[in-house]
């Protein structure tokens, strides 16, 4: 499921946001009268220009879960710099729960070499050339959040220089 939405905020640049569903699962809660069925949706949104977010929504129907997931995504968007060859500037590692991911920059034309939920997060963020490996658990939510954790560790040179000058 992919949908494009445009955001225009009073003269600001108009970005096109895409959203994708990573996983929809049926979950149950045991209550006094029996079992209560609900759905959990894991959603990723990105603008293909270095901004991406992962969110989770739970509701009694699938459409409501997806809507709640999208609103959760919008609250958790991160931004990071992309190089001119649409890759990351340096290798990074990210962890969330038992999931751990390794992201390494790759040469022009190699494409996205990644799997699972990590691939969806990388594609929607706008990275075109990268090598990625997920270690540990195969849980979709933990791998997506570990990828977000790794991407949030990326810094531009100007911010690295300001950190170095601040520490001196």
From Swiss-Prot:
<dbReference type="GO" id="GO:0015935">
    <property type="term" value="C:small ribosomal subunit"/>
</dbReference>
<keyword id="KW-0150">Chloroplast</keyword>
<dbReference type="GO" id="GO:0003735">
    <property type="term" value="F:structural constituent of ribosome"/>
</dbReference>
<comment type="similarity">
    <text>Belongs to the universal ribosomal protein uS5 family.</text>
</comment>
<feature type="domain" description="S5 DRBM">
    <location>
        <begin position="17"/>
        <end position="80"/>
    </location>
</feature>
<dbReference type="GO" id="GO:0009507">
    <property type="term" value="C:chloroplast"/>
</dbReference>
<comment type="subunit">
    <text>Part of the 30S ribosomal subunit. Contacts protein S4.</text>
</comment>
<keyword id="KW-0699">rRNA-binding</keyword>
<keyword id="KW-0694">RNA-binding</keyword>
<dbReference type="InterPro" id="IPR013810">
    <property type="entry name" value="Ribosomal_uS5_N"/>
</dbReference>
<dbReference type="GO" id="GO:0019843">
    <property type="term" value="F:rRNA binding"/>
</dbReference>
<keyword id="KW-0934">Plastid</keyword>
<dbReference type="GO" id="GO:0006412">
    <property type="term" value="P:translation"/>
</dbReference>
<protein>
    <recommendedName>
        <fullName>Small ribosomal subunit protein uS5c</fullName>
    </recommendedName>
</protein>
<dbReference type="InterPro" id="IPR014721">
    <property type="entry name" value="Ribsml_uS5_D2-typ_fold_subgr"/>
</dbReference>
<dbReference type="Pfam" id="PF03719">
    <property type="entry name" value="Ribosomal_S5_C"/>
</dbReference>
<dbReference type="InterPro" id="IPR020568">
    <property type="entry name" value="Ribosomal_Su5_D2-typ_SF"/>
</dbReference>
<dbReference type="InterPro" id="IPR018192">
    <property type="entry name" value="Ribosomal_uS5_N_CS"/>
</dbReference>
<comment type="function">
    <text>With S4 and S12 plays an important role in translational accuracy.</text>
</comment>
<dbReference type="InterPro" id="IPR000851">
    <property type="entry name" value="Ribosomal_uS5"/>
</dbReference>
<keyword id="KW-0689">Ribosomal protein</keyword>
<dbReference type="InterPro" id="IPR005712">
    <property type="entry name" value="Ribosomal_uS5_bac-type"/>
</dbReference>
<keyword id="KW-0687">Ribonucleoprotein</keyword>
<dbReference type="InterPro" id="IPR005324">
    <property type="entry name" value="Ribosomal_uS5_C"/>
</dbReference>
<dbReference type="Pfam" id="PF00333">
    <property type="entry name" value="Ribosomal_S5"/>
</dbReference>
């Amino acid at each position: 499921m992919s949908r494009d939405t445009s955001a225009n905020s009073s003269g600001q640049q108009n970005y096109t946001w895409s959203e994708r569903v990573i996983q929809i699962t049926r979950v149950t809660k045991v209550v006094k009268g029996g079992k209560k069925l609900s759905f959990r949706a894991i959603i990723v949104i990105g603008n293909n220009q270095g901004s991406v977010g992962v969110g989770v929504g739970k509701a009694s129907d699938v459409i409501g879960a997806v809507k709640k997931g999208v609103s959760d995504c919008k609250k958790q968007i991160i931004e990071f710099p992309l190089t001119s060859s649409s890759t990351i500037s340096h290798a990074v590692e990210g962890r969330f729960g038992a999931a751990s991911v390794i992201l390494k920059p790759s040469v022009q034309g190699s494409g996205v070499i990644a799997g699972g939920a990590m691939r969806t997060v990388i594609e929607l963020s706008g990275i075109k050339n990268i090598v990625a490996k997920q270690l540990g658990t195969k849980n979709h939510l933990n791998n997506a959040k570990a990828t977000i954790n790794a991407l949030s560790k990326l810094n531009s040179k100007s911010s690295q220089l300001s950190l170095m000058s601040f520490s001196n």
